Amino acid sequence: MRVAGKGLIDRNRVLRFTFGGQSFEGFAGDSLASALLANDQRLIGRSFKYHRPRGIVTAGSEEPNALVTLERGFAREPNSRATMQPLYDGLVARPQNAWPSLKFDVLAVNDVLAPFLSAGFYYKTFMWPRKFWEWVYEPAIRQAAGLGALSKRYDHELYEKAYAHCDVLIIGAGPAGLMAALTAGRAGLDVILADEHDQLGGRLLSEMEHIDGMPAAAWVQAAVAELAGFANVRIMANTTVTGAYDQGVFGALERVGLGVEALPEGLPRETFWRIYTKGAILCAGALERQIAFANNDRPGIMAAGAMRSYLNRFGVSPGQRVAIFGNNADAHRTARDFAQAGVEVVAMIDSRAEAQPLGDYPLYTGAVVTGSRGRLALKSIDIRQNDGSVKRIDCDALGVSGGWNPSVHLTCHMNGRPVWDPALASFTPQPGAIPGLVAAGAAAGEMSTQGALAQGQAEALTLAKALGKRVKPSALPVADATPYEITPFWDVGGTGRAWLDFQNDVTVKDIKQAVQENFRSVEHMKRYTTQGMATDQGKNSNVAALAVLADATGRGIPETGTTTFRPPYVPVALAALGAGGHGKGFAPERLLTSDRMSRERGAPMVEAGLWYRPSYFPQEGETHWRQACDREVQMVRNTVGICDVSTLGKIDIQGPDAAAFLDFLYTNSFASLKQGRVRYGLMLREDGHVMDDGTCARLGADHYLMTTTTAAAGQVMRHMDFVHQGLRPDLDVSFTSVTEHWAQFAVAGPEARALLNGILDRKISNKTLPYMGYKAVQLGGIAARLFRISFSGEHAYELAVPARYGESLFQLLLARAEALGGGAYGLEALNVLRIEKGFITHAEIHGRTTAFDIGLARMVSEAKDCIGKTMAARPGLVGPERDQLVGLRPIGEVKQIIPGAHLFAPEAQAVSKNDEGYVTSMCYSPTLGSVIAQAFLRDGRNRHGQQIKMVEHLSGVTTLCEVCAPVFFDPEGGRLRG
């Protein structure tokens, strides 16, 4: 209900919204959660496992219960926290994890079955009959699991990634954060002030405090106005710092479009920031924890500090008759504020015997809440008084405060561990856990406003001095300095179910059961019970759960330890992390210099990594790609063909130790390679498996040009960087990728030399440019590189020119080729040509094959060392038991061979234990007039001439094949060298 005269909302601006199909009204400045409470909507959702009724618990990002699905036109955003969603006119939200309705949820039957669904039930309950797991149990569990549902529609909203640099990043804009920002801003530092809420001020907006004689909210307004006037201060509201990383890098999620339905064109819904800073101050405050008692999860039971936030910031009371239960002095502030606002406070239950009231309300000292009543919302509580008597109190809202936990999460993101502070009964940040990050205010365990202001100023001054700024501290504002008093109290005890993790339905009993079943480690307990594995990551429950675990194991909380803190601090949309990573342009589209002309000729383009390459070049009268492919293959075999091979990786290598570097990378020697010659090379990973193959030309005494496959160009470049920096930093060598510097074209076929001699400034011959040779040439006065290498098995060359001349050269080559009866050929024909010749691609060197497997073991030099050499000789990586490269020809009635199909002995049953290999590549060869294939077959080189059965289980195709050598065309190589 609304409370007159309270809150920072604008009651003159009425906003309409819907929840669960019902229409409601709120005010500007409301959150969705506060507006729902103002409309007496206490039932907001259902829990994950038992589907128990759930209401709002907190007022921040740690909210475990009030998760809703927001709808914006066709867009749907599940698992949105109502506590963090500013209200806007037309907002549409609906509850989730309930069917058919929120009030009547069929799966609430799980709560009746709770004895069978206790901790670790999935390891024990559904074990029999065994085959039911796959067909019955697992599908049923997966169907029931989850909270919100993703939309299956394409997300048309814009997301961005961005980078920012600053002197100091201040995380959180409460009293410590604002004071730190003012101090750093006045000192002239470049400041970023990030806060996850839409309004700055932190807890100051939720308290009835005064700073320097003015209301805290007014002081916040003045501080923010001053900060906004600094050119060196950037204020980022609605921005959650999600992770701390090496070298002063922080991740942050800015929810740009959080408070509007439709964004202006070009404005992103969310932006994920990478912030680089010289220093950071964590002022993220503290999170209130619960006390476990029977049925403490009913709607209407919430954090006492959150109740205070809804009253003082939003002008909302979650009930008409309010009770408070706590173990610390801060809980009394809630009772005081509600009483002063005219809301009936029926009880302040304090577990401490010596507690003193702060106002006019009934106080029960040395008492505890033992249970609650109500089906879909709280109706009453039972308390046990200090004399042992039990009393029932009617109320519709209960605020619970088990103390405050400093927000240590970011300080632990680099494997640091927090430090237990017995005075606070909480974990506090470990100093120096994150280099350059310090904590101030409640995040550092300083719970008073005066202390938070002082720490924020002190840490900012220290950082300013470290960065060379001379600054005099300004007068510190005067604020409340009341010390924080607490007597630890975690669990009331009793026979009823007392809840710790509200979202995942983890109870005190579950923790104790995990201990009984010997899951005593905190990490084991976490995974066995799912404690702290919900979307709030245990922010509300982990410390209380650790206390229960410590008690059950007879240890202290410090000895029990904490689970590992990992980023992100709050859930981050994958669309924000991968901004720009969806749709066709998720990565750079790399186009050939011949792209325009290829498309003009009707060539369908296919993706080859990030490149677009022509698949084939159709001609008039051709109705199927095979017709074009067969024609192009025969064209290359009989006349001449032109193919753009610019996509091959090209790495320029120079330096006195270039040859030694290549010898270390490749299995074979390149120090012995003569200038003007090209050599085929094989590169291994450190585990002995083939990484890549390609050619390397020696352009000068200390100058080489390496080519890689299109698929592995980036991988090879990264590998070379690693080898040079990590393994051989002693070598004086430099290398750089020049893939896009050069346009390179294969000229293949019997007429290849004739074509080139028609365009080169000086003619070539077999003597001046033999097979596997290189020559610097000119055509029309333009310097070019000519390599005599072949991937087709034909007399062939590769001609490279600076990329700016690529399109013109392609046009020239194409015209000359067509005049000789040839033309362009695409990727399909290139694949057929290489299979006919027995050449391999990454279909064969797919990461699981060795030099021995592909028949190139002799290329591993005995005279030198190289990466992977020793590992490649391990038992199991050589020998007849290995799958070895072979060729296949169909010899039965069925002529179909399918890549990926498995090979079996002709009479063997086609099951896994009889598997003898698999097909990697196949094509129809117009040269041979039949289907041919490459495959890996166990001991294949000794089985040429034998028969093998190919079985493709998905399509049900079985083909009898003859095993042969992988080289089908011109095995002597006469056409290459002619």
Spans of model-derived segments:
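Acidic, proline/glycine-enriched N-terminal capping motif
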Residues: 544, 552-684, 689-691
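Short beta-strand segments
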Residues: 22-24, 273-275, 391-393, 692, ...
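Hydrophobic side chains in well-ordered alpha-helices
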Residues: 180-181, 334, 448, 452, ...
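Conserved, structured C-terminal
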Residues: 595, 599-600, 613, 700-703, ...
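Residues forming anionic-ligand binding surfaces in small-molecule and nucleic-acid pockets
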Residues: 286, 519, 630-646, 690-703, ...
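A short, contiguous, amphipathic alpha-helix enriched in charged residues
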Residues: 34-44, 656-673, 754, 758-762
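Residues forming the flavin
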Residues: 1-589, 741
